Curated annotation (Swiss-Prot):
NCBIfam families: uS13_bact (TIGR03631). Part of the 30S ribosomal subunit. Forms a loose heterodimer with protein S19. Forms two bridges to the 50S subunit in the 70S ribosome. InterPro entries: Rbsml_uS13_C, Ribosomal_uS13, Ribosomal_uS13-like_H2TH, Ribosomal_uS13_bac-type, Ribosomal_uS13_CS. This is Small ribosomal subunit protein uS13. Residues 108-126 have a biased composition (Basic residues). Residues 98-126 are annotated as: Disordered. It comes from Parabacteroides distasonis (strain ATCC 8503 / DSM 20701 / CIP 104284 / JCM 5825 / NCTC 11152).
Length: 126
């Protein structure tokens, strides 16, 4: 039986600490603190959790963390706000360039996308 927490099926064969990181918004340290607060051993695999342990983990995540859809929408709203106020970071988001001061003369291919070839200008004859 798969354990579903906030709409995500946790992998059965992984330890609880690792399995919780499949939830958007929960990393390794958050997963450790969730399991500690819920009183679940970190090293137990998800398939060995009891229904009571799964319910406790669900309860802790629901009460203390903003995850999945809520977090995604908050991040999107933050980016939209930056673009609306027209600050530097918002402008860089809008034109699809790096935000944090990286040089774009040679690299930044991930952010800029695939190369666009520009036709060569014919050299002027002397």
């Amino acid at each position: 039986m798969a354990i579903r927490i906030v709409g995500v099926d946790l992998p059965q064969n992984k330890r609880g600490e690792i399995a919780l990181t499949y939830i958007y918004g929960i990393g390794r340290s958050a997963a450790k603190s969730v399991l500690d607060k819920a009183g679940v051993d970190r090293d137990i695999k998800v398939k060995d959790w009891t229904d009571d342990q799964a319910a406790k983990v669900r309860e802790v995540i629901g009460a203390e963390y903003k995850v999945e859809g809520d977090l995604r929408s908050e991040v999107q709203l933050n980016i939209k706000r930056l673009m609306d106020i027209g600050c530097y970071r918002g402008v860089r988001h809008r034109v699809g360039l790096p935000l944090r001061g990286q040089s774009t003369k040679n690299n930044a291919r991930t952010r800029k996308g695939k190369k666009k070839t520009v036709a060569n200008k014919k050299k002027a004859t002397k």
